[in-house]
């Protein structure tokens, strides 16, 4: 009996180590649909979750407080939030006001969280010129820092340059998207942008399904994480990039476009609260792209 118990404990520890650096993320639509039993199931294979708290013109995610409580009750140790803001979206400018509103609402709702990630990616009708976009993102990051929030940036090598040009030196953590289904930081050419030389987290697969919940898969830290089944069409030899978390314009169209600096561009798709986002891509192979989506207007 003692041997059996010891063997069981070893197996449980092994499972915990395999998933020690696994994380999932999902958009505001999914936030409002995850049940307590879903959370219990998700907690068995993930130590971290990132949920969308703000979605452009659609604003604050109303169910975020109960979702965070559900994740905490299930035993997920690290809970992050992400916000998609855009300077052409209603109620988002100046970004300092939007960030102040988000942080204030979270405090009023009694929400405790580890980090707030600023989602930087393209969507139709969401952005102005590169200079204005860069100033908008920098203001958002600096405002969060001034409020004492642990803040980082989510983007990809392609989305970053398309959205904010050569903006660099923000000095915050990077969560990058590269859909190569490889939970590691071995793909340095895909996170060396914006002045970053090392990342905190990688979104390595999208459009996956865990416990009946639509999620994107992420890796963080320096431990191990078994690759989950996500999807992302396109990209050859793992050399494309994209970003996800999704956004849509005020007219209800959305985009989570994948782009590359290498031999191909990845594609992914994501649903938004008013439409579906998709990233375009070329070439074939097992791939890397990105795309979950959530709406912004």
UniProtKB/Swiss-Prot annotation:
Example of a GO MF term: lysozyme activity
Cross-referenced Gene3D superfamilies: Glycosidases
Signal peptide as annotated in the record: 1-20
Disruption outcome: Formation of large groups.
Compartment list: Secreted
Biased amino acid composition, Gly residues: 276-297
UniProt record similarity statement: Belongs to the glycosyl hydrolase 25 family.
Protein role: Cell-counting factor that limits the maximum size of the multicellular structure during aggregation.
Name the UniProt record assigns to this protein: Counting factor 45-1
Source organism of the structure: Dictyostelium discoideum
